[in-house]
Structures are given as structure tokens and as C-alpha cells.
Amino acid sequence: TYVTRCLQKTDDIRRLTDRMFEYALVYDVSEPEQIRMIPFSLSRLLGLFREQMDFLELAGFHTDISFPDADISDITTPDALTIQADPELCKRILNNLFSNILKYGSKQETVTLSMQLPPEINKDAALCLALKNTVKPEHSAVESNRIGLKSSTRNMERMGGKLVVFQTNTFFEVTLSFPVTAP
């Protein structure tokens, strides 16, 4: 239908502009844009992940969110963990990661998000979120320029965090580590 085609074109344009920005961010050595670091609650960060996971489900993926180290009340209380982050950079990072899952991920296996809380809050404490999925067989040997991952890695570093990728021909895992601040 006409509306479906319009939505597809809108998505195509968004992806193209995202790619242009990513190329500029990764390869431009001039001064990067200013970031706006603000206190970001754990529940707010998880809300961004949940939105993306919900979108995957609408696209036909199976998802699972697992927090083995945390009681749900630990996550939703107002004084739960806080990170310092730029909300827009967080959204960009998640858009990159989840668009890769949409493009390369297999709908036959579950996409999982797991979280590891730091045992104690100190200067080295980090909140780790791991996103795992199986790669579609037809994409297992596809070469990519990894611009989105490079951009996401750089954005995590700009916020004082870290992004680590582990990948095989059939499996993809990315771990985001955010420095934690005391409530």
C-alpha cells in the first residue's frame, strides 16, 4: 500500500542519514560534537533497551531479557544504580546495534539481553549489558565495513564506557559497559 511504501522510504532515508553521520563520526578527526552527560537511571536505560526489544518482536524475532544478578525491585527503585550518559548517544548506539540484528540476525533463535550489576559501587564499577543473537546463515560470511559498530564503540568511549564485540560466523555478542555512579 501507499502508506507502507511511505514508511519504507522514511526508514530508508533515516538509514542513509545515519550512515552519513556514522562515516563522518568514525573518519572525521576534527572536533566531535559536544555530548550532554546527565544522570541516567538504570530503569531509564533499560527502558531504551526494552523499546528496541519490543520492536524486534514486532519484526518477528523472539527476545528474552534476563537479569540473573538483580531483583526487579533493585532495578525499578528511584535510587537504583545511575550512570552518566548522553541520552541521544545511547539511542544512536542502540539503533545501530538493533538495526544490525534486524539486518543480520536469525529469527530462528532468541535474541537475549542480560545484565550484570557491579558487586559494589567504586570508581571502577561498571554496569554491563550483553546483547546476543544468532547470525542468519546467509550472512555468516558477509564482509561488512562495521561503520555502525565503530561509531558505537567511539560513542561509548566518549561517554567513558566500553563496547566489546565477540563474533563468530554464527553468533554475535556485544557488551556495553557503563561506568556507575553512586545514587
Stretches with model-predicted labels:
Residues 125-147:
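Glycine-rich/acidic phosphate-handling loop/turn and adjacent ATP-lid/helix
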